[in-house]
């Protein structure tokens, strides 16, 4: 009996057993080998197949190929190589997101893209605009949008897991000795603020989910205008909604909301307002820690007086300084003007600080010389600049307190644009998104409360008119200002200054630029503040501004 060569053995094994790939999955090969050694009879019992090879005439030994036999449920696991389509689509989306981050949003690959920090900031901002951009109603988020927000935000935030800092740590040897090693932990700002932002995010999503069964509903603006005469449930729209024509109009029942529903709305509003304050605090802290970019400092004027203007500079350098009085004299009737004043104050602060830094360097050089008088003059200038910086910062703080939702200034936008720290970029963009979301929820709640208040007032007026009709009085005659005082006791109004509304009464005098006083005009002094962050005035006027 002749023996076969090794080459013939390889041919036989390749013909009988098929080709073998070294890159095959280990788990798959193990499962295949385990299943190939057993066969199952009709009753479910397994018996082993003889593993010894049998001899084939003229060909040598024949090794039987492994065969996958039926699998009994509960005893073995079925291996499926096919992945669901949704998993494949999520992987493709993740690849696309991270490709944009690595390329810096430059799809040409020429290296002209933005830095990684700005790319992540833009990605979080664009994701929030996609999911929450049309937050026009108090209703739960669609399941698709909610899943998209959680999935893609987790992809973007996973970058922070690799941002760590090294700290010394003491470890012990098994024999009793100790040695010092450097240990990694999350960076302190991310460790403190990122879990808090995730908690605020979850609370806002849960708040929207709670508006699944409400007593109010919404109608498109075109439908409201078209059916104005037919709909008996029409509720008056707020002044803000007349400007924001694309927003749907909230509607309430003819008798208004129930006390329980109104109380729930008020609680949600207070809760959202607290979330807004927390997000603002985190965002302000992160922006304050960012470095001031050089391009911003290069665009500043040479003097603080040029930044502020003549009027603000005179008030700021006066002997008696009151930030509240100065703000009352300024024109803060629009968002653009208020933001412009904030930009001027910030620019003046950094101009004076730059001068102090330069003079400190000159002072250090002049100490070695004999120019004592010049050094004394530089010290006086530094003290004066420090004094002006303190007053300007006090004025800016008072402005932010009066308008807590002031938009980002030019300095803030430059910090975001030129920031290189990825961790700070994640915290700033995430907190800004939470701030915007909390503000929009508060605005939507204010819309519903305003419509409910208007409905209650109309009901009270109707009841008053019906009461006069029951008593036999003509309401038109009773309240007519054209009748004589002798004909109706209601016709003569009480011309008393104290009868005016304390919040809407115009000032009796206004300060002019030259310091003189003149009588105020109601039409000029009573201007509506339409800025998005004026949270304090919304409760008084019932007008809720909108953040674009």
From Swiss-Prot:
GO terms for biological process? Answer: pollen tube growth; positive regulation of Rho guanyl-nucleotide exchange factor activity; regulation of auxin polar transport; regulation of pollen tube growth
Query: Which PROSITE patterns does the UniProt entry name for this protein?
Result: PRONE
User: Which regions span the lipid bilayer?
Assistant: none
Q: Give me the stretches of Low complexity compositional bias.
A: 19-36
One GO MF term on file is: guanyl-nucleotide exchange factor activity
Which InterPro entries has this protein been placed in? PRONE_dom, RopGEF
Tissue distribution of the protein = Expressed in roots, cotyledons, leaves, stems, sepals, petals, anthers, pollen grains, stigmas and siliques.
**Keywords, comma-separated and alphabetical:** Cell membrane, Cytoplasm, Guanine-nucleotide releasing factor, Membrane, Phosphoprotein, Stress response
Question: What region holds the PRONE domain?
Answer: 81-462
Post-translational events: Phosphorylated at Ser-460 and Ser-480 by PRK2.
Bias category Acidic residues: which stretches? 1-12
Q: Where in the cell is it found?
A: Cytoplasm, Cytosol; Cell membrane
Claim: NADP is one of the keywords in the record? no
Q: What happens when the gene is disrupted?
A: No visible phenotype under normal growth conditions.
Source organism superkingdom: Eukaryota
What does the record say about activity regulation? Phosphorylation at Ser-460 and Ser-480 by PRK2 releases ROPGEF1 auto-inhibition, thereby activating ROPGEF1, which in turn activates ARAC11/ROP1.
- Annotated region Disordered: the residues are 1-38
Entry domain remark: The PRONE (plant-specific Rop nucleotide exchanger) domain is responsible for the GEF activity. The intrinsic dissociation of ROP4-GDP is stimulated 15-fold by the PRONE domain, whereas that of ROP1-GDP is increased 350-fold.
Chain's role: Guanine-nucleotide exchange factor (GEF) that acts as an activator of Rop (Rho of plants) GTPases by promoting the exchange of GDP for GTP. Acts downstream of PRK2 in the control of polarized pollen tube growth by activating ARAC11/ROP1. In association with ROPGEF4, acts as a specific regulator of ARAC10/ROP11 function in ABA-mediated stomatal closure. May play a role in the Rac/Rop-signaling pathway that controls ROS-mediated root hair development.
Miscellaneous note, as given in the UniProt record, is: Plants overexpressing ROPGEF1 or ROPGEF4 are relatively insensitive to ABA-induced stomatal closure and become severely wilted during drought stress. A similar phenotype is observed in plants expressing a constitutively active ARAC10/ROP11.
What protein name does the entry list?
Rop guanine nucleotide exchange factor 1
Q: Which gene encodes it?
A: ROPGEF1
